[in-house]
Design a protein with these regions (language model features):
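Phosphate/dinucleotide-binding and metal-coordinating scaffold of catalytic cores
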Residues: 1-104
Length: 104
């Protein structure tokens, strides 16, 4: 199981969790977080979101095209490993949301 802290404007908003065994993903807002939602599709009022595939909002933070190819090649990341891709670029995303892997 891999986890990543998710920040909105530098404030920790919640955690993204990848359950590789069951091939599922969850995003959970921190109980004390009362800032803006990280996405209009993920309101703060609902504290937990579950996905069968990599969450669309986080997929939208990933590089595409030439930038994706360079990332996969230089970091030796599998094309199907969206979580690792996000960890590689998570602190340098476009917009207010950043992501940082939780060390084991």
């Amino acid at each position: 199981m891999r986890k990543a802290n998710v920040y909105m404007h530098g404030e920790r908003a919640g955690m993204l969790i990848e359950d590789k065994k069951n091939e599922k993903y969850r995003f959970i807002y921190d109980e004390e977080y009362d800032g803006q939602p990280i996405s209009v599709t993920m309101p703060v009022e609902k504290k937990e979101f579950q996905y069968e595939q990599f969450p669309p909002f986080f997929e939208g933070l990933l590089p595409e095209g030439v930038n994706l190819e360079m990332l996969l090649r230089t970091k030796k990341i599998d094309r199907d490993d969206a979580f690792s891709q996000l960890m590689a670029v998570g602190e340098d995303t476009v917009g207010a949301v950043t992501v940082q892997e939780v060390e084991k």
